[in-house]
UniProtKB/Swiss-Prot annotation:
Family matches, as SUPFAM superfamilies: EF-Tu/eEF-1alpha/eIF2-gamma C-terminal domain, P-loop containing nucleoside triphosphate hydrolases, Translation proteins
Protein purpose: GTP hydrolase that promotes the GTP-dependent binding of aminoacyl-tRNA to the A-site of ribosomes during protein biosynthesis.
Region feature (G5): 174-176
Official protein name in the record: Elongation factor Tu, chloroplastic
Keywords assigned by UniProt, alphabetized: Chloroplast, Elongation factor, GTP-binding, Hydrolase, Magnesium, Metal-binding, Nucleotide-binding, Plastid, Protein biosynthesis
Location of region: G3: 81-84
Region of interest: G4: 136-139
Species in which this protein is naturally found: Mesostigma viride (Green alga)
EC number: 3.6.5.3
Compartments it resides in: Plastid, Chloroplast
Amino acid sequence: MAREKFERKKPHINIGTIGHVDHGKTTLTAAITMALAVGTGKSGKRYDEIDAAPEEKARGITINTAHVEYETETRHYAHVDCPGHADYVKNMITGAAQMDGAILVVSGADGPMPQTKEHILLAKQVGVPNMVVFLNKEDQVDDPELLELVELEVRETLNSYDFPGDEIPVVAGSALMALEALTQDSKLARGSNPWVDKIYALMDQVDKYIPTPQRDTDKPFLMAIEDVFSITGRGTVATGRVERGKVVVGENVDIVGLANIPQNTTVTGLEMFQKTLEESVAGDNVGVLLRGIQKDQVERGMVLAKPNTIKPHIRFESEVYVLAKEEGGRHTPFFPGYRPQFYVRTTDVTGKIDSFKADDGSDTQMVMPGDRVKMVVSLIQPIAIEKGMRFAIREGGRTVGAGIVSEILE
């Protein structure tokens, strides 16, 4: 069956929900898809369709990132519902890297919680430039003054992580009440239900406040591989988000990383949201069909790139901020020879920290939680690295630092 073409009529934005577990991220995502499907002939997504990652059912915790799409009058959105649970921050680091903006969901009944702060910090680290706040569960808050206090606390928290907390739009509402109303009557237009209207009000703010990003379309093509599938009779498909540049069916690409020498292949097809494309540009979440490549020759953590534009490296110098104990970082110092995981794009690679330098250029033998430091890192596997690239340092399931590559050494 021929797939229909993906039409590019509106600017495309990648967005996601972040916030503490059980504050209502997935419920809000479902309510947005249902509200924006009204009158379009499309259908929204139910809560259980978004929450459908296989491991979750036992614990009711979102683990995998769910991708949904919807449109406002001015834009097309791809929305990731980020995992809320601390153990799955690993997924958020790969998922949040996909966001041009975020909707921070905070329960108006509880206020900011530890994971709220962790997600704001992560958003800062992975470079999510803008966010809008949804104060959820307004129906459970009897005293309007209480909601105002929660809003103030959220704004202060955002300020403390260098987001413009005073100007970020905050919309209060109840995702559950809106979702229930839309489930009973899927044709509720604007103005017919106060709870549903709050969802529209939220999306109006997202449209207005989160700018359409300047895509890096003119730079050389690069896409970090998130997943690899084998399609019988057609070959191997690598999926991911195009980070920069564009790729056209028929072009050659290098597959770089986790090996010393890049592989070269030809792109034989492109698909987005199950529709075929002739070309794919920065910002697209896309599947790339690769000629003559076996499924076991590519894996998550490699990148597809324009030939000879990026090389695999194992050693680099970086500027790193080591999280303080209060931010969920380590409680004890670490020393040269420390071996944590380095998260780069979609990969986690073990690396050894060879040496540290203080801001004044002097060698230092010990790094305390809360320090900012220059460090030289040697990875155990080569991956596609370039100057200015961000990464996270993780250990035992938690983020202990965030950094940016300042020099490539080998």
